[in-house]
Amino acid sequence: MVAIAILAAGKGTRMKSGLPKVLHSLGGRSLLGWVLNSAAEVEPERQIVIVGYRSEMVRESLQAVPGLEFVEQAEQLGTGHAVQQVIPLLQGYEDSLLVLNGDVPLLRPQTLKLLLDTHRRHNNAATLLTAHVPDPKGYGRVICDGNNILKQIIEDRDCTPAQKQNHRVNAGIYCFRWPDLAEVLPKLQANNNQQEYYLTDVVNDLSPVMAVDVEDYEEILGINDRKQLALAYQILQNRIKDQAMAAGVTLIDPDSITIDDTVKLEVDVVIEPQTHLRGHTTIGTGSRIGPGSLIENSQIGANVTISYSVVSDSVIQAGTRVGPYAHLRGHVEVGSQCRIGNFVELKNTKLGDRTNAAHLAYLGDTTTGTGVNIGAGTITANYDGVKKHRTQIGDRTKTGSNSVLVAPLILGNDVTVAAGSTITENVPDDCLAVARSRQVVKPGWRLKQPDPT
């Protein structure tokens, strides 16, 4: 069994934001969301989040995560002080405690498993994660014997010139035998210039303590400012895109493409340049997305083509073509083998299979049957200034160019709407609807010209 404590109380002053640092977004999740996602892989018995700055906002952001416990750190007096807050919650607990930081989002689940397995296998009082970094400036140096048993953690400012050449650093991620930690935590002193309680002081008082190296030092990157956030995003994108290409996805220009971790791509998907896939999006096999497209929180079927378009909160079935310059938003459902062309906007609309809206149309709050053809310039006038109304269009119905369908409205099956018509009344099956002024032609008519003299 293992319990996990996640330090998430800090304000993050260097972020220069009203948002708690751990709630800043990174590739589809918050920083804290990434930590929780990795933590879940070790199947913890308990997960305790230590909150402080804007704690209610942090709690609210995690409402969908089951089984979390929260404890308040009213004053942020260091990492040791933060872990002291969990003592009342773990009375009688006899197993391991993983201590994680809510602003270290790149830590892989397998690294946590390695840390926990090493801790248990050697029956350590504590096991800490270490990394060999190219530039160790600012990190505490870890001194071990030949068996990776900790001898000392030395803060950067206290290192001798020789010790500064040591590139093995403390990642600030620990696994403790909880009864041992609970015994020494209350004795922790703030004997430093910052008057803070450091968890490293506790580690130096426990025995035996072992260090285990992370395979990739980038995993321990902490986020303290916007530049580090951007760096973490680049690292994360490289991970995601490498995994996608290894799984049979073609990325034409990886450097210009962004993909959230929550996106699912099937084999033989092709992503063109300048395309961005966000949120809980799935792309079916054989689909081609882009160039220049944004897909967000949408489910795209197999063999769909989308170019230069924005699709959000929508479902598109197999074989449909979208774009260029289409906009689908607000719970759109498009059937299979449809055509959504240039400068077409769909909002809260459901289109049946084999329906075409090839160009210059707006359909809002609309439902169509199958085989419908929406002529160029057709719009549904769905808003009366107070509320939205729906338009229902039957199978095989056709609207002529420049038609206005004033909702609420029902067009039956096999209806034809004449070009230029404004339809305000329901139209039964098999009817032609014409609603426009009759053309008048006056022979010999021309405007009087001014006298040039």
From Swiss-Prot:
It is found in: Cytoplasm. Acetyl-CoA binds at residues 376, 382-383, 401, 419, 436. One of its GO terms (molecular function) is UDP-N-acetylglucosamine diphosphorylase activity. Mg(2+) binds at residues 103, 224. It catalyses: alpha-D-glucosamine 1-phosphate + acetyl-CoA = N-acetyl-alpha-D-glucosamine 1-phosphate + CoA + H(+); N-acetyl-alpha-D-glucosamine 1-phosphate + UTP + H(+) = UDP-N-acetyl-alpha-D-glucosamine + diphosphate. Pathway: Nucleotide-sugar biosynthesis; UDP-N-acetyl-alpha-D-glucosamine biosynthesis; N-acetyl-alpha-D-glucosamine 1-phosphate from alpha-D-glucosamine 6-phosphate (route II): step 2/2; Nucleotide-sugar biosynthesis; UDP-N-acetyl-alpha-D-glucosamine biosynthesis; UDP-N-acetyl-alpha-D-glucosamine from N-acetyl-alpha-D-glucosamine 1-phosphate: step 1/1; Bacterial outer membrane biogenesis; LPS lipid A biosynthesis. Binds 1 Mg(2+) ion per subunit. UDP-N-acetyl-alpha-D-glucosamine binds at residues 7-10, 21, 73, 78-79, 140, 155, 170, 224, 329, 347, 362, 373. InterPro entries: Bifunctional_GlmU (IPR005882), GlmU-like (IPR050065), GlmU_C_LbH (IPR038009), Hexapep (IPR001451), MobA-like_NTP_Trfase (IPR025877), Nucleotide-diphossugar_trans (IPR029044), Trimer_LpxA-like_sf (IPR011004). Pfam families: Hexapep (PF00132), Hexapep_2 (PF14602), NTP_transf_3 (PF12804). Its main location: cytoplasm. Residues 248-453 are annotated as: N-acetyltransferase. Residues 227-247 are annotated as: Linker. Keywords: Acyltransferase, Cell shape, Cell wall biogenesis/degradation, Cytoplasm, Magnesium, Metal-binding, Multifunctional enzyme, Nucleotidyltransferase, Peptidoglycan synthesis, Repeat, Transferase. The keyword Cytoplasm applies. Residues 1-226 are annotated as: Pyrophosphorylase. Its EC number is 2.7.7.23, 2.3.1.157. Gene3D superfamilies: Hexapeptide repeat proteins, Spore Coat Polysaccharide Biosynthesis Protein SpsA, Chain A. The keyword Cell wall biogenesis/degradation applies. In the N-terminal section; belongs to the N-acetylglucosamine-1-phosphate uridyltransferase family. In the C-terminal section; belongs to the transferase hexapeptide repeat family. Catalyzes the last two sequential reactions in the de novo biosynthetic pathway for UDP-N-acetylglucosamine (UDP-GlcNAc). The C-terminal domain catalyzes the transfer of acetyl group from acetyl coenzyme A to glucosamine-1-phosphate (GlcN-1-P) to produce N-acetylglucosamine-1-phosphate (GlcNAc-1-P), which is converted into UDP-GlcNAc by the transfer of uridine 5-monophosphate (from uridine 5-triphosphate), a reaction catalyzed by the N-terminal domain. This is Bifunctional protein GlmU. The gene is glmU.
